[in-house]
Design a protein with these regions (language model features):
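Generic secondary-structure signature for well-ordered alpha-helical cores
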Residues: 12, 16-23, 39, 69, ...
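Short, charged low-complexity intrinsically disordered segments located at boundaries
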Residues: 38-49, 66, 195-206
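Catalytic cores of large soluble enzymes that bind and process phosphate-bearing ligands
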Residues: 3-6, 10, 22, 52, ...
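Internal, active-site/partner-interface "lid" segment
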Residues: 134, 148, 175-207
Length: 208
């Protein structure tokens, strides 16, 4: 029989998962790779993952793009049908796989390295000793929190932590590059956020 959670227990489990994100992850190495490859080298950040992890990867890419770091999502399966040609030698790739064993993502690494042997990879995973961890340059652990799903299977707490680790990278890079309200308004013209960013532009918040 599956476990039954109260609303309070679900919220507590999600909060605890965030509290137990490892503090000793090499965040600085991941941030430095993005800065050196994208902002200094002119490459792009490519994110990738399958299933729910892939949806998180897509969100991270769009958030990076809107905040001054050119990024896009590459579907691991579509990469095998021509989309791998979107990758350039100066890029850096951010992979997300909770198990660290996702076949399509492992194949993506192998195929990319066949084209560009020195292209660096960052991995967000719940399994530090996984096959993917052995292949990448930087591993960021989620702490492998138990899923709050009553079956213990559906990605729930794990995807919460993946999202937060993505936010950590985005915000850290924004701060390093000095991203301003004006910069934001140029990339996000429409909607409430576009209006708000333009309202906040002042002589003290110029573009870089």
């Amino acid at each position: 029989m599956s476990k039954q959670y109260t609303i309070t227990e679900i919220l507590s489990a999600e909060i605890e998962a965030l509290r137990t994100i490892p503090q000793d992850n090499d965040y600085e190495a991941a941030i430095s790779l993005i800065l050196s490859r994208v902002h200094q080298g002119g490459g792009r950040l490519i994110t990738s993952g399958m299933g729910k992890a892939g949806q998180i990867a897509h969100n991270i890419a769009t958030t990076f793009s809107s905040t001054g770091t050119p990024a896009y999502f590459l579907h691991p399966s579509e990469a095998q049908h021509g989309d791998l040609g979107m990758v350039c030698e100066g890029d850096v790739m951010l992979l997300i796989s909770n198990s660290g064993k996702t076949r399509e993502v492992l194949e993506l690494v192998a195929l990319t390295r066949r084209m560009y042997p020195h292209l660096p990879f960052i991995l967000i995973t719940g399994n530090n000793e996984s096959p993917l961890s052995e292949l990448v340059d930087v591993t960021l652990s989620t702490g492998n929190p138990p899923e709050v799903c009553p079956l213990g299977l559906t990605p729930t707490t794990s995807t919460t932590v993946m999202t937060v680790l993505g936010d950590l990278l985005v915000v850290s890079v924004m701060q390093r590059i000095g991203f301003t309200y004006h910069d934001y308004s140029l990339r996000h013209h429409g909607g409430y956020l576009g209006d708000k960013s333009r309202e906040l532009v002042t002589p003290e918040t110029p573009a870089k």
